[in-house]
């Protein structure tokens, strides 16, 4: 018999899972229909679609972890599972990073030759960013697969067993350090791009207030809404990365409040940010409304 707090947690996990599948599915379907109609896809739509697909798989794995935690289902420990998880996790992280870089290059106003060059060519670089991420993540997975025999038992026994001994601690420590370091690279790139974008939007907002003080101008709230959207992206992305680092380096036990809270927060990022993307994109928002209205009519 499940305890009451575990039942509540599982209901929240189900809602989170369904929201993540729905929001990311909307992004994939809308951009897929546009691709079929126009035989081409805009660079931003391509990046959003790839990010949404990776988040769907990430959401599936997070829900699988929740089911394991709640119902104590046996997890199959093998290098294939470790490689798949690492591939999905790293790929989603890099694609989200490139999305932050794309927004920064398109929106921010910085008078620097390198930034101007990036601003003019960012659209053409998007396919290469995606391809480069795929190749890089694949190489990382091959590297870690050699040590999966140590990594997989370590992370699973750390959560599921209180009396576990791990062999070859030196090798394991190197792997954990490299695992955390790999998260740091996209995180630093993302932080630099998004903080630069926030600074640029904040400066633009102050200039508008000084220019049109006391008057109402159409579109005046657009920079503020964009700033809030980017700030929410930053908070979700940063908290997601930090919790992954904590789970990788510290010791927790399942069914404890802190562990359940961390897993729930990890799942908020791929669903919550995709919802923000839909609300901030007129095309995605309109198609999401059409889908909901069509679903109500079919009932």
UniProtKB/Swiss-Prot annotation:
It comes from the Eukaryota. Belongs to the G-protein coupled receptor T2R family. GO terms for cellular component: membrane; plasma membrane. Pfam families: TAS2R. GO terms for molecular function: bitter taste receptor activity; G protein-coupled receptor activity; taste receptor activity. InterPro entries: TAS2R (IPR007960). Residues 1-9, 77-81, 146-178, 244-257 are extracellular. Glycans are attached at residue 163. GO terms for biological process: detection of chemical stimulus involved in sensory perception of bitter taste. It is a multi-pass membrane protein. Its main location: membrane. Most taste cells may be activated by a limited number of bitter compounds; individual taste cells can discriminate among bitter stimuli. The keyword Mitochondrion does not apply. This is Taste receptor type 2 member 1. It is found in: Membrane. Expressed in subsets of taste receptor cells of the tongue and palate epithelium and exclusively in gustducin-positive cells. Keywords: G-protein coupled receptor, Glycoprotein, Membrane, Receptor, Sensory transduction, Taste, Transducer, Transmembrane, Transmembrane helix. Receptor that may play a role in the perception of bitterness and is gustducin-linked. May play a role in sensing the chemical composition of the gastrointestinal content. The activity of this receptor may stimulate alpha gustducin, mediate PLC-beta-2 activation and lead to the gating of TRPM5. Residues 31-55, 103-124, 200-222, 279-299 are cytoplasmic. The keyword Transmembrane helix applies. PANTHER family: TASTE RECEPTOR TYPE 2, TASTE RECEPTOR TYPE 2 MEMBER 1. The chain crosses the membrane at residues 10-30, 56-76, 82-102, 125-145, 179-199, 223-243, 258-278.
